[in-house]
């Protein structure tokens, strides 16, 4: 069927029925899952903190073999904790922003 503009309207599909691409995107899992990445990051921070605590205990007991490596371990743990806290703060701010959004 043609209208006055010469466009065949029978071939035009409604927007809702042509969602094959959307389904393909939903079913694809190419990247890492966000929750898994977050858990791995928290585990890494925990490992850094444990290494730092061991280095501090070795310094306190006089068993430290390399003071420079102990200082590096402590600094790494401090930096990883700062990054994790910053990620937490950003997540909390994003959550608060979503709560303020009016529908």
Curated annotation (Swiss-Prot):
Primary location group: other
Which Gene Ontology molecular-function terms are recorded?
A: cytoskeletal motor activity; structural molecule activity
Q: Enumerate the subcellular locations listed in this protein's record, separating them with semicolons.
A: Bacterial flagellum basal body
Of the GO CC terms on this record, one is:
bacterial-type flagellum basal body
Taxonomically, the superkingdom here is Bacteria
Q: Biological process GO terms, please?
A: bacterial-type flagellum-dependent cell motility
What's in the keyword line of the UniProt record? Answer: Bacterial flagellum
The answer to whether keyword ATP-binding applies is: no
Carries keyword Oxidoreductase?
no
Where do the TM regions start and end? none
Assigned protein family:
Belongs to the FliE family.
Tell me the protein's name: Flagellar hook-basal body complex protein FliE
**Could you read off the lineage of the organism from its UniProt record?**
Bacteria, Pseudomonadati, Campylobacterota, Epsilonproteobacteria, Campylobacterales
Q: What's the gene?
A: fliE
């Amino acid at each position: 069927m043609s209208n006055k503009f010469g466009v065949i309207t029978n071939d035009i599909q409604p927007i809702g029925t042509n969602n094959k691409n959307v389904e393909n995107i939903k079913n694809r899992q190419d990247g890492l899952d966000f929750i898994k990445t977050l858990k791995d990051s928290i585990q890494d921070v925990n490992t850094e903190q444990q290494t730092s605590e061991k280095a501090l205990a070795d310094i306190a007991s006089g068993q430290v073999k390399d003071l420079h490596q102990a200082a590096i371990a402590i600094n790494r743990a401090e930096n990883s904790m700062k990054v994790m806290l910053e990620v937490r703060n950003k997540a909390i701010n994003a959550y608060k922003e979503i709560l303020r959004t009016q529908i």
